[in-house]
Amino acid sequence: MKIERKQSVVLVPHPYQGHLTPMLQLGSILHSQGFSVIVAHTQYNTPNYSNHPQFVFHSMDDGLQGIDMSFPSLENIYDMNENCKAPLRNYLVSMMEEEGDQLACIVYDNVMFFVDDVATQLKLPSIVLRTFSAAYLHSMITILQQPEIYLPFEDSQLLDPLPELHPLRFKDVPFPIINNTVPEPILDFCRAMSDIGSSVATIWNTMQDLESSMLLRLQEHYKVPFFPIGPVHKMASLVSSTSILEEDNSCIEWLDRQAPNSVLYVSLGSLVRIDHKELIETAWGLANSDQPFLWVIRPGSVSGFQCAEALPDGFEKMVGERGRIVKWAPQKQVLAHPAVAGFFTHCGWNSTLESICEEVPMVCRPFLADQLVNARYLSQIYKVGFELEVIERTVIEKTIRKLMLSEEGKDVKKRVADMKQKIVAGMQIDCTSHKNLNDLVDFISALPSRLAPPTPVFGAIMSSNHIASKCIIES
């Protein structure tokens, strides 16, 4: 239902692309429900205001000018959280002093955990947005609660299953690993990121019909209302591009010239860096597969090289018109194109949902954090992709051909199509994601404008009759 009186919601996104995109999509959803949306963002990776004329934007001084932010570091993330406290607090105070729309709440990305301190000081209700899968957060919390069970581990254990975390193995521990353990500063950061402080609820870019059992376990842990309203890129209507990088739309014209269900789309996201050896092995794996491909090689994504100069001699001549290389692509449009039959992906959560929603099966090449968990679920639980265990050209070639040409690949394509239909069903009127969105709107509308004293709201939006006891897709 739409609210009758105008209320404002302040969104505080984390600036990296994989976090910024779902927050802006959430903003579009909330705006469509009658809320005024204010985006308080860092100076780094400033969104394109012209793409979102329905929002009010406020730039916060993040104090990181001149610092290389192309790949995240703990120091930079902590500095960003500290530097943005005063700018956000001052802005919110000025908002509350002005007459006009009522400030309903602050919604913040879990990596911007400083917001909880600011909201608590001002006695404003806050809500956390989780931009990753429930399976990832569950694995993270399980390890954080008893790290001695999992860390450190021996090389001989890499392929052994993680206790209580099927289908993960020790090599899939979703933290940066150094000498077969996780440094304490990284564990401390993950504790801060997974905590919700005094926040009164959590919004999820996932679906009950995909992760019901994980969501129930996590809700028992956090004891606040959960609102799984994903996939937000589909729930948001007519969203303009949220990309920070310039998209090369000419690749769509190239796809138009390809046969239906023939092209492998290759993209490793907005942050991943690979070494030159991996690029060479990937290039020859693509070339030797004899399959048409669209390959995104982002500037700066190959250590020590810039885009095409890193490609092996003779590669472009060998593949000719069968391959197209771009610096960045309009991914949702690419995955929806009838020529695309597979996705060679890093398994970031946005890419995962976008691929499933377009019935595109995956070659899974994860690198870190949630990507490792997503890849295992995609390949072992949902069985809609094949995981690359070895980055070697013959293995890459065989995996691509298995996905694109084999009977096993046909089975994977059928499963991802079935998975899409269940997700689409959940977005219909009176179904799970749509109901959860209505509940979220009612919840925000009913929040007091000031909390005194600031305490979390306990209870369950997802009651036993609201969420299936066992999700079909998980079974």
Curated annotation (Swiss-Prot):
Residues the entry annotates as binding an anthocyanidin: 19, 369
Superkingdom of this protein's organism: Eukaryota
GO MF annotations in UniProt: abscisic acid glucosyltransferase activity; quercetin 3-O-glucosyltransferase activity; quercetin 7-O-glucosyltransferase activity
A Pfam cross-reference name: UDPGT
Keywords, in A-Z order: Cytoplasm, Glycosyltransferase, Nucleus, Transferase
Top-level EC class: transferase
Tissue: Expressed in flowers and fruits.
Primary localization: cytoplasm
GO CC annotations, alphabetized: cytoplasm; nucleus
Active-site residue numbers: 19, 109
Annotated positions binding UDP-alpha-D-glucose: 131, 329, 331, 346, 349-351, 354, 370-371
UniProt catalytic activity: 2-cis-(+)-abscisate + UDP-alpha-D-glucose = beta-D-glucopyranosyl cis-(+)-abscisate + UDP
Temperature-related behavior of activity: Optimum temperature is 37 degrees Celsius.
EC number(s) stated in the UniProt entry for this protein: 2.4.1.263
Subcellular location: Cytoplasm; Nucleus
Disulphide connectivity of cysteines: none
Keyword NAD: no
Record-linked InterPro entries: UDP_glucos_trans, UDP_glycos_trans_CS
Keyword Transcription found: no
pH-activity dependence text: Optimum pH is 3.87-7.
Family affiliation: Belongs to the UDP-glycosyltransferase family.
PANTHER family documented for this protein: UDP-GLYCOSYLTRANSFERASE 72B1, UDP-GLYCOSYLTRANSFERASE 76B1-LIKE
Protein role: Glucosyltransferase acting on abscisic acid (ABA) but not on auxin (IAA).
Protein name: UDP-glycosyltransferase 76E1
Organism this protein belongs to: Solanum lycopersicum
UniProt gene name: UGT76E1
